[in-house]
Amino acid sequence: MKNKIKVFRAMHDLTQEDLAQIVGVTRQTILAIEKGKYVPSLDLAFKIARHFKVNIEEVFLYSEEGRTIDVD
């Protein structure tokens, strides 16, 4: 699943470790999510979006059959 976590982290001057501690996961989990190698649970996705005070759709881009669906 494509996402903009790295962009939001940069905007808020957070490291992967910082965000991991905030949402209660490991740095490796944040890295895997950013690289699209791990799809977060709905609970974790909401925690990440809430931390940045944005809608979940602004952070995560839903992909169906390899296509990214633009939710804007």
Where are these regions (language model features)?
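DNA major-groove recognition helix of helix-turn-helix/homeodomain DNA-binding modules
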Residues: 43-58
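Alpha-helical and His/Cys-centered functional microenvironments
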Residues: 20, 31-32, 55
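Key DNA-contact positions within bacterial/archaeal DNA-binding proteins
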Residues: 17, 28, 57
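Short basic helix-loop element that most often maps to the first helix and adjoining turn
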Residues: 3-22
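Recognition helix of helix-turn-helix/homeodomain-like DNA-binding domains
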Residues: 25-38
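Short, conserved catalytic or interaction motifs in soluble domains
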Residues: 35, 54, 64
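Short, charged recognition helix plus adjacent turn
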Residues: 60-72
